[in-house]
């Protein structure tokens, strides 16, 4: 039985099928994303969504959807599905679905009377193109397929509406057409692998709604332009391939291209293979530069997310070359930042105070997976430069105090991963001595000291160790409270007593200022108050301001973002901490916990982990939104 298969009963029940979504990407940052019944419910959904660099730094929906119609004996059966005003869905093509399977590639099987039609979609890896193969599995009379493309040509953050500026011009190409609605956009080529008839019948389909945007309090309707439709005859056993891309392709190559792309895929036939496939989706190549996107569908390459996620996305999969390729770009961006030069790389938020420390942590994982000697040869100079940059107090918002701790101003702008804002201000103004920033600092000092000592630089190693001694003593004095857990941040006489997961890093890191008994106390409190089946809570239910309900308009969600929701990415560090305390005896717990996460592969964003969980009903609030740090 297929690992990711959904039967007719689930598919025709929109309450079950609409919340389940699929995402496929390529390394240019383009993607295809929709629900498993091909009904778009978000403005970010689309069949072909691509970056258009000459316009802006956003992705753009070119082809929103493709409605198929099966025609026999003059009778038409439309397989499309859109939501309109008043909870009205049309043309209700989901009622013909017999099953949906995405173990290999997303495959939908329709049954219309005596017709069985299989639709398979694949997003091409190395160019901005989606291919859809239709196979007539069974039919008892002459059959025609009609394809009606719904065009948007707009940013994923905007909507399009009927307007006179949209160009209706098109030109015939081999077995298809090319068209472009607005200046600055690339031409969209829509072709089939066999001869067909294109009927030019331009029209706007008005009032299409996106209920997920409505839930968030945003505008939620738009008009989509349909230039006409393609018609092609198909025989029993025959396959027809539809292509949409930004360059022309030879129709004779479409079947071969489809087959080669399928052969290149790793099936999502297990929990591990699902995670592996999802991990690969965050890689982004732009010319010679290699980035890691923070998440889909809207995040760009953010520095903190890059360094936290990079070991899991590469080294955990045995992909050392990929790690080095990304770090080659990241290292250049780091040096530009350290030298005060304008950024020429698309890695955002490099100025955040914990970013360089997370970079050291990422390189520490590289040293563990390869060797310290290899890490020293590759990145030894960079590690020394980062620590020196911080130690010499050259960072604009990272101040090394005499007590050895790093002080950060986070009152006006969010400066850590808990970065939600409302009305231009941090929802959680973490400021002063921040617990994970100083845990990272201690870890970096000890790690780099050991590295340079092994390289023969005893003087620098002794200097860093001396600094670590001061930092470690102050860390315990400042952060550890009478109840055995750690303050989340301390600013003068203001101590944040909230029980948050950021203290777990101090137990998880290779070097910690806490002794074993102190580590166990921290782990016990995190386990008791923050551990859930879906990740660590961002705030204990016993702490003031606890709110696990990530629902409603965006402003309401912003306030709840880090106030009780559970985040899967934190579990990696929790498990590291658990194994440091319980050693081999803790392995069975880790295994059981991971097995409990496997049911997420068939919920919400299929085959992937979500960014966060709403814990009020233990369900996912952001099913499509995937973050690289979750892997």
Short names for language-model regions:
Residues 1-267, 271, 297, 304, ...:
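Terminal accessory carbohydrate-recognition/targeting modules of carbohydrate-active enzymes
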Residues 2-82, 189-194, 220-221, 418-431, ...:
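Aromatic (Trp/Tyr) and acidic
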Residues 138-139, 160-163, 172, 234-236, ...:
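Aromatic-rich carbohydrate-recognition surfaces in CAZymes
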Residues 200, 204-232, 418-427, 431, ...:
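Glycine-rich phosphate/pyrophosphate-binding loop
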Residues 224, 228-231, 293-300, 346-350, ...:
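Short, solvent-exposed segments of well-ordered alpha helices
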Residues 273, 391, 398-401, 442-550, ...:
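Catalytic cores of carbohydrate-active enzymes
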Residues 280-297, 326, 332-348, 392-426, ...:
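Glycine- and aromatic-rich loop/turn segments at beta-sheet edges
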Residues 618-631:
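Single conserved hydrophobic/aromatic residue that forms the stacking wall/gate
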């Amino acid at each position: 039985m297929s690992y990711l298969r959904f039967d007719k009963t689930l598919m025709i029940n929109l309450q079950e099928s609409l919340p389940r979504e699929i995402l496929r990407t390529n390394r240019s940052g383009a993607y295809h994303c929709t629900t498993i019944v091909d009904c778009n419910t978000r403005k970010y959904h689309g069949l072909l969504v691509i970056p258009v660099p000459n316009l802006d730094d956003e992705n753009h929906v070119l082809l929103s959807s493709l409605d198929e119609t099966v025609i026999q004996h003059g009778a038409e059966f439309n397989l499309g599905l859109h939501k309109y005003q008043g909870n009205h869905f049309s043309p209700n093509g989901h009622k013909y679905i017999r099953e949906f399977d995405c173990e290999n590639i997303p495959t939908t099987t329709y049954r219309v009377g005596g017709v069985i039609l299989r639709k398979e979609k694949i997003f091409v890896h190395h160019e901005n193109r989606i291919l859809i193969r239709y196979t007539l599995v069974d039919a008892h009379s002459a059959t025609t397929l009609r394809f009606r493309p719904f065009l948007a040509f707009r940013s994923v953050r905007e909507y399009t509406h009927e307007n006179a500026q949209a160009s209706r011009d098109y030109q015939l190409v081999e077995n298809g057409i090319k068209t472009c609605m607005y200046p600055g956009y690339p031409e969209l080529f829509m072709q089939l692998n066999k001869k067909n008839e294109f009927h030019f019948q331009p029209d706007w389909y008005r009032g299409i709604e996106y209920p997920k945007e409505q839930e968030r309090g945003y505008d939620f309707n738009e008009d989509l332009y349909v230039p006409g439709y393609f018609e092609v005859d198909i025989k029993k056993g025959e396959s027809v391939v539809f292509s949409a891309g930004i360059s022309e392709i030879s129709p004779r190559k479409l079947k071969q291209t489809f087959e080669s792309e399928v052969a290149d895929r790793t099936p999502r036939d297990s929990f591990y293979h699902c995670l592996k496939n999802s991990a690969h989706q965050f890689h982004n190549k732009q010319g010679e530069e290699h980035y890691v996107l923070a998440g889909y569908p809207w995040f760009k390459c953010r520095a903190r997310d890059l360094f936290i996620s990079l070991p899991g996305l590469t080294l955990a999969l045995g992909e050392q070359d990929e790690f080095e390729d990304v770090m080659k770009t990241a290292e250049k961006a780091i040096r530009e930042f350290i030298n005060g030069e304008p950024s020429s790389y698309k890695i955002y938020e490099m100025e955040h105070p914990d970013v360089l420390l997370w970079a050291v942590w990422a390189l520490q994982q590289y040293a563990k997976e390869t060797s310290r000697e290899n890490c020293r040869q590759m990145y030894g100079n960079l590690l020394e430069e980062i620590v020196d940059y911080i130690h010499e107090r050259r960072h604009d918002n990272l101040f090394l105090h005499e007590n050895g701790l790093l002080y950060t101003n986070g009152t006006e702008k969010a400066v850590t991963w808990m970065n939600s804002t409302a009305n231009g201000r941090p929802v959680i103004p973490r400021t002063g001595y921040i617990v994970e920033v100083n845990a990272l600092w201690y870890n970096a000092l000890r790690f780099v000291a050991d590295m340079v000592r092994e390289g023969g630089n005893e003087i620098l190693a002794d200097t860093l160790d001396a600094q670590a001694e001061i930092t470690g003593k102050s860390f315990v004095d400042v952060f550890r409270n009478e109840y055995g857990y750690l303050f989340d941040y301390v600013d003068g006489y203001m101590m944040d007593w909230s029980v948050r997961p950021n203290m777990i890093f101090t137990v998880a890191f290779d070097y910690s200022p806490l002794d074993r008994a102190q580590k166990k106390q921290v782990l016990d409190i995190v386990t008791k108050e923050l551990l859930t089946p879906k990740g660590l809570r961002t705030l204990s239910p016993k702490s003031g301001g606890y709110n696990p309900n990530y629902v409603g308009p965006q402003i309401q969600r912003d306030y709840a973002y880090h106030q009780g929701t559970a985040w899967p990415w934190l579990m990696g560090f929790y498990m590291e901490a658990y194994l440091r305390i319980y050693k081999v005896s803790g392995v069975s717990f880790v295994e059981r916990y991971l097995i409990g996460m496997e049911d997420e592969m068939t919920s919400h964003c299929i085959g992937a982990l979500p960014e966060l969980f709403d814990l009020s009903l233990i369900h996912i609030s952001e099913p499509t939104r995937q973050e690289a740090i979750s892997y």
